[in-house]
UniProtKB/Swiss-Prot annotation:
It comes from Mus musculus. It comes from the Eukaryota. Changing E464 to D/A: Remains sensitive to Mg(2+). A motif (Selectivity for potassium) lies at residues 352-355. Ethanol and carbon monoxide-bound heme increase channel activation. Heme inhibits channel activation. Homotetramer; which constitutes the calcium-activated potassium channel. Interacts with beta subunits KCNMB1, KCNMB2, KCNMB3 and KCNMB4. Interacts with gamma subunits LRRC26, LRRC38, LRRC52 and LRRC55. Beta and gamma subunits are accessory, and modulate its activity. Interacts with RAB11B. Residues 556-576 are annotated as: Segment S7. The modification Phosphoserine is found at S711, S724, S728, S924, S928, S1194, S1197. It is a multi-pass membrane protein. This is Calcium-activated potassium channel subunit alpha-1. One of its GO terms (cellular component) is voltage-gated potassium channel complex. Residues 1005-1025 are annotated as: Segment S10. Residues 1193-1209 have a biased composition (Basic and acidic residues). Residues 783-803 are annotated as: Segment S9.
Length: 1209
């Protein structure tokens, strides 16, 4: 052949070794060496001269001159007589298939369009003829046309059926379609792998189809691709668009060359690299298999598949043109590059590094690189950083929680911020909780910021964070919610829309309960009325530990209790918050306050040594010997038909005998101290004086070894499982305390509804709001005294506070009717109308429309004579600047403190609010202050306006002028609600609090004049470790709200009146908080230098009163007299703590049945007849004893200065 001869001549001319007869073979071998680095791999297809060819090839590699002379157009072994390259045949098969099909489609569309146009014109002609012929000939002439239309319809139906069948076959909506799609993708990857294997061979080589295994596999794959292509073509609605799709183009340039290779017995690597474009569908395949479910994972796989497929495809094109050469250069400028070297070349090109060790030599290769570098650089710069970011984030907060054997975990979700998490962890992981073997898993859909991330790292041994949502079951499975000990949901206390926040948390509860109904959930709620929605969840069960901590209910309940005993809100808030003991050597008020702050509330089962003893006896023994303060026990009724078998009784009195397994509620500094009540043994510890030596003794070890005989108690969550006695508490109580005595039953009027249906609250018939509204002139003519003034900021668009939660504790049924403090609301009438629906069933409530910033309104309601002024705002969360959220409350507080009052107010009894402890002498009328409700003639209208005041009959106690002690607004008892803790610094201008001081360390909070909702955050962890703590707090704070009452309010949104029955009246028999003054009365001798322990024992033994704290003047420790009237709270002082005469003692007082038997009378008379109007009262002042020794003069001066201090509040 001509080309062969040319090659031979060149070979001999160059002086190459070998005879002239081997010139053709040498030329062929040199060309084969130019096409591939491994020429010997192709020599296996030659006949008997393979060994000589191999040796000739190896010798010719070292002849550099031959490369310039040889024209590499023949193959290693000629497949035909001429030895021509046939790459054009492979390429032509693909081009003919593509353009031929495209031409047919376009031709078909053109003919179809012309046919449509012609039929449209013909249809108009036939329609005109049909109209002209008339309807009489329609049946005969149209019959053949109908037959044709039926045939056409049948044909269309058959084609549609085939098309639908093909669509179902390739659709991923059916199992067959999914299997087919996955199979096509897998075979495409297999064909790509075969291409990788064949890329080590020359671009074009002779292959025997019957002997080449890879060619046979590739042929089978492509036959399947051809069938799948046919299905896709049939199912396609737009054939032209289908023909131009990427997957179709891939099939055009990969399937036909395989059939050509079988016909020609040769293989051309060609465009088989286009199979790499199938990798773009990788994310779709994984979605079909339900492997990819999240948006981030889908996006990551999409980016990776597009990047890799583009990279591999471009590398295949460079490999083809560089190993083949330029056709117009007769393929002389080729270079031998492996496929993976081309992959490397494309990567350094996309990254703009370009080392230069590998580069394109052909013109086609360089031209391709010019265009590829533009798109490749853009793709590299955008895809790679995004891929790295997705991979980094996924590794950081993705994945699943791995449970540790023997260690519980809880899931915390909801409002996850730096403030909420830090407050939660500070309380949950406090050292006073003993060993907390619980891991905390936070789940939130937003990744934490740097500060929050640093907080998680500081607690990495016990805290993990996962990004996700509790509304997604997949994320719940990731955090192992089914094996979690509990799930805690935090709320955003500062949100602008509390109802929307509650709705979000309720949806979280629904999602979690739907995934795992048995999980224990503790959630925060902002609005009280939204708690009713939790009752609609079938798996919500408060008896199994599910709890909803309503911040509005508890916040207003704490404030209401401060109206009865100022400072109680601070004391209770400190009790369920974990605080470390801070020791101060200086004799300042902070020293005594911080000693009380370190106390918390714990529960522990009582030792068997206490069995058979009364509650006061056990309480005294614990206080004196064990240095523990027990305030309540858990009572479990033996009556199985009772609606609530298990109750918590606070200071139940001496009628109760304790049995085995009684759970006690203690106030102590840490959990280890409380264990003394469980380990105490009379035989071993009776003579022990140091309470630290009371530990587990031999007697208790013998008891523990005995097999249990009763069912085990519920676990105690003080850091793990507790070994406790196995008996249920059985409390024996005399019937007269469970059901009122005969005298009280006789006095009941069964036809009058005084209490609600549960008997827990005072009730009256619903009143219209117009009947309780006072104008400013009417209020100015009304002398109000001993009342509660509620200053409320709000308007028609403000979120509701829920004032019912403030009024309910003040209307608890354990007060007698005449003991109820009148409540006067001062605020916007538009706002109060929205709240009135929940308030219209409570007695003694009035409204003065106005603003708390108006001094005229404040003077009209006699704010200087009130027992407490409460300042609330419903507009706090509508301001973006947190420092301005409390501006209204702060301005109102400062406005009241700056007011001055004159001496024109009448004379009132100094101790008009005094209580006499039950059991004292009430027979003398001189010891019973008279409470009169008088009407004074109005100057303007002449009608009788009620004067709500408390008058005392002149007796042994001196008369003082009230205005002498409250001539300044600074002496008005006040409590202000704050949203932002740091704003507490603005309430007292004379304090020295640092702006960075924690809230509980500030003077306004310690004095009980400020309250912030943030202190309630500690209830989440306290409730988790002991669910009884929340029940006790709610019992103390809400005045007796129960889950049954909440269900009733959820049904009717109001209290329902009920008749007085022995069962409902029995609910009145419960303790209430009061304040005992040491200025006068039976404890006055202990007030001057006496010990707190002696007072504790005397009050408990004599009057069944349980003392638990002191409300002391701030400067009482100073030797010099002070004009400051501020007080601070001392929680659970020790036995030897010294008392001062001005102290007020916090105590739990028993309900007195007989105190309210004599009815209060209303006298409608003039102001001059005040002294003759009387009504008996349970509010007794403690009489001065005649034989009490005279006090020193300094004491007398203090008596006169503090005569306003009441025996009880």
């Amino acid at each position: 052949m001509a080309n062969g001869g040319g090659g031979g001549g060149g070979s001999s001319g160059g002086g190459g070794g070998g005879g002239g007869g081997s010139g053709l073979r040498m030329s062929s071998n040199i060309h084969a060496n130019n096409l591939s680095l491994d020429a010997s791999s192709s020599s296996s297809s030659s006949s008997s001269s393979s060994s000589s060819s191999s040796s000739s090839s190896s010798s010719s590699v070292h002849e550099p001159k031959m490369d310039a002379l040889i024209i590499p157009v023949t193959m290693e072994v000629p497949c035909d007589s001429r030895g021509q390259r046939m790459w054009w045949a492979f390429l032509a098969s693909s081009m003919v298939t593509f353009f031929g099909g495209l031409f047919i489609i376009l031709l078909w569309r053109t003919l179809k369009y012309l046919w449509t146009v012609c039929c449209h014109c013909g249809g108009k002609t036939k329609e005109a003829q049909k109209i002209n012929n008339g309807s009489s000939q329609a049946d005969g002439t149209l019959k053949p046309v109908d037959e044709k239309e039926e045939v056409v319809a049948a044909e269309v139906g058959w084609m549609t059926s085939v098309k639908d069948w093909a669509g179902v076959m390739i659709s991923a909506q059916t199992l067959t379609g999914r299997v087919l799609v996955v199979l096509v993708f897998a075979l495409s990857i297999g064909a790509l792998v075969i291409y990788f294997i064949d890329s080590s061979n020359p671009i074009e080589s002779c292959q025997n189809f019957y002997k080449d295994f890879t060619l046979q596999i590739d042929m089978a794959f492509n036959v399947f691709f051809l069938l799948y292509f046919g299905l896709r073509f049939i199912a396609a609605n737009d054939k032209l668009w289908f023909w131009l799709e990427v997957n179709s183009v891939v099939d055009f340039f990969t399937v036909p060359p395989v059939f050509v290779s079988v016909y020609l017995n040769r293989s051309w690597l060609g465009l088989r690299f286009l199979r790499a474009l199938r990798l773009i569908q990788f994310s779709e395949i994984l979605q079909f298999l339900n492997i990819l479910k999240t948006s981030n994972s889908i996006k990551l796989v999409n980016l990776l598949s597009i990047f890799i497929s583009t990279w591999l495809t471009a590398a295949g094109f460079i490999h083809l043109v560089e190993n083949s050469g330029d056709p117009w250069e007769n393929f002389q400028n080729n270079q031998a590059l492996t496929y993976w070297e081309c992959v490397y070349l494309l990567m350094v090109t996309m990254s703009t590094v370009g080392y230069g060790d590998v580069y394109a030599k052909t013109t086609l290769g360089r031209l391709f690189m010019v265009f590829f570098i533009l798109g490749g650089l853009a793709m590299f710069a955008s895809y790679v950083p995004e891929i790295i970011e997705l991979i980094g984030n996924r590794k950081k907060y993705g994945g699943s929680y791995s449970a540790v054997s023997g260690r519980k975990h809880i899931v915390v979700c909801g409002h996850i911020t730096l403030e909420s998490v830090s407050n939660f962890l500070k309380d949950f992981l406090h050292k006073d909780r003993d060993d907390v073997n619980v891991e905390i898993v936070f789940l939130h859909n937003i990744s934490p910021n740097l500060e929050l991330e640093a907080l998680f790292k500081r607690h990495f041994t016990q805290v993990e964070f996962y990004q996700g949502s509790v509304l997604n079951p997949h994320d719940l499975a990731r955090v192992k919610i089914e094996s979690a000990d509990a799930c805690l949901i935090l709320a955003n206390k500062y949100c602008a829309d509390p109802d929307a926040e509650d709705a979000s948390n309720i949806m979280r509860v629904i999602s979690i309960k739907n995934y795992h109904p048995k999980i224990r959930i503790i959630t925060q709620m902002l609005q009280y009325h939204n708690k009713a929605h939790l009752l609609n969840i079938p798996s919500w069960n408060w008896k199994e530990g599910d709890d909803a901590i309503c911040l509005a209910e508890l916040k207003l309940g704490f404030i209401a209790q401060s109206c009865l005993a100022q400072g109680l809100s601070t004391m209770l808030a400190n009790l369920f918050s974990m605080r470390s003991f801070i020791k101060i050597e200086e004799d300042t008020w902070q020293k005594y306050y911080l000693e009380g702050v370190s106390n918390e509330m714990y529960t522990e089962y009582l030792s068997s040594a206490f069995v058979g003893l009364s509650f006061p006896t056990v309480c005294e023994l614990c206080f004196v010997k064990l240095k523990l303060l027990m305030i309540a026990i858990e009572y479990k009724s033996a009556n199985r038909e009772s609606r609530s078998r298990k109750r918590i009784l606070i200071n139940p009195g001496n009628h109760l005998k304790i049995q085995e397994g009684t759970l006690g509620f203690f106030i102590a500094s840490d959990a280890k101290e409380v264990k003394r009540a469980f380990f105490y043994c009379k035989a071993c510890h009776d003579d022990v004086t140091d309470p630290k030596r009371i530990k587990k003794c031999g007697c208790r070890r013998l008891e523990d070894e005995q097999p249990p005989t009763l069912s085990p108690k519920k676990k105690q969550r003080n850091g793990g499982m507790r070994n406790s006695p196995n008996t249920s508490p059985k409390l024996m109580r005399h019937d007269p305390l469970l059901i009122p005595g005969n005298d009280q039953i006789d006095n009941m009027d069964s036809n009058v509804k005084k209490y609600d249906s549960t008997g827990m609250f005072h009730w009256c018939a619903p009143k219209e709001i117009e009947k309780v509204i006072l104008t400013r002139s009417e209020a100015a003519m009304t002398v109000l005294s001993g009342h509660v003034v509620v200053c409320i900021f709000g308007d028609v668009s403000s979120a509701l506070i829920g004032l019912r939660n403030l009024v309910m504790p003040l209307r608890a049924s354990n007060f007698h009717y005449h003991e109820l403090k009148h409540i006067v609301f001062v605020g916007s009438i538009e706002y109060l109308k929205r709240e009135w629906e929940t308030l219209h069933n409570f007695p003694k409530v009035s409204i003065l429309p106005g603003t708390p910033l108006s001094r005229a309104d404040l003077r009209a309601v006699n704010i200087n004579l009130c027992d407490m002024c409460v300042i609330l705002s419903a507009n706090q969360n509508n301001i973006d600047d947190t420092s301005l959220q409390d501006k209204e409350c702060i301005l109102a507080s400062l406005n009241i403190k700056s007011m001055q009052f004159d001496d024109s107010i009448g004379v009132l009894q100094a101790n008009s609010q005094g209580f006499t402890p039950p059991g004292m002498d009430r027979s003398s009328p001189d010891n019973s202050p008279v409470h009169g409700m008088l009407r004074q003639p109005s100057i303007t209208t002449g009608v009788n306006i009620p004067i709500i005041t408390e008058l005392a009959k002149p007796g042994k106690l001196p008369l003082v002028s009230v205005n002498q002690e409250k001539n300044s607004g600074t002496h008005i008892l006040m409590i202000t609600e704050l949203v932002n803790d740091t704003n507490v610094q603005f309430l007292d201008q004379d304090d020295d609090d640092d702006p960075d001081t924690e809230l509980y360390l500030t003077q306004p909070f310690a004095c009980g004049t400020a309250f912030a909702v943030s202190v309630l955050d500690s209830l989440m962890s306290a409730t988790y470790f002991n669910d009884n703590i929340l029940t006790l707090i709610r019992t103390l704070v809400t005045g007796g709200a129960t889950p049954e009452l909440e269900a009733l309010i959820a049904e009717e949104n109001a209290l329902r009146g009920g008749y007085s029955t022995p069962q409902t009246l029995a609910n009145r028999d419960r303790c209430r908080v009061a304040q005992l003054a040491l200025l006068d009365g039976p404890f006055a001798d202990l007030g001057d230098g006496g010990c707190y322990g002696d007072l504790f024992c005397k009050a408990l033994k004599t009057y069944n009163m349980l003392c638990f704290g002191i409300y002391r003047l701030r400067d009482a420790h100073l030797s010099t007299p002070s004009q400051c009237t501020k007080r601070y709270v001392i929680t659970n002082p020790p036995y030897e703590f010294e008392l001062v005469p001005t102290d007020l003692i916090f105590c739990l007082m028993q309900f007195d049945h007989n105190a309210g038997q004599s009815r209060a009378s209303l006298s409608h008379s003039s102001h001059s007849s005040q002294s003759s109007s009387k009504k008996s009262s349970s509010v007794h002042s403690i009489p001065s004893t005649a034989n009490r020794p005279n006090r020193p003069k300094s004491r007398e001066s203090r008596d006169k200065q503090n005569r306003k201090e009441m025996v009880y509040r």
